[in-house]
Design a protein with these regions (language model features):
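Non-heme di-metal
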Residues: 1-117
């Protein structure tokens, strides 16, 4: 993605880092279950910071789409299809993704692409 910042913003913050938003709550629960509350608290801080990273990428992605006359949502899903064969892993952390700049419609479309259903 180094050759195109639009592609980088779509795939690094809005796909890879956003996946961190999805999986962190489950990891936190596992640490809580074994009594490691300190690690769970650290992961909560990391989750909050990760929302900011994804939000930053979302803003830049939308800005770059606007500069190129591209519709952001369709462009994002076209890139997911081209680079990931349109398949993603779930579950999604809807609240964190919304806070990070994903629309409800994007979340619905992402859910439809989840592996296995």
């Amino acid at each position: 993605t180094a050759h195109d910042p639009l592609i980088r913003m779509a795939l690094v913050p809005r796909m890879l880092e956003a996946r961190g938003l999805d999986v962190t709550p489950g990891i936190m629960r596992r640490f809580e279950a074994i009594g490691d509350h300190e690690t769970a608290a650290v992961l909560q801080i990391i989750l909050r910071e990760e929302v900011g990273h994804v939000q930053f990428g979302s803003r830049w992605f939308h800005y770059l789409c606007e500069q190129r006359g591209l519709e952001p949502e369709q462009t994002y899903f076209d890139l997911l299809e081209n680079f990931l064969n349109g398949e993603i892993r779930c579950p999604l952390h809807h609240e964190a993704r919304r806070e990070a700049g994903f629309s409800n419609q994007e979340l619905q479309r992402l859910e439809a692409l989840c592996a296995g259903g």
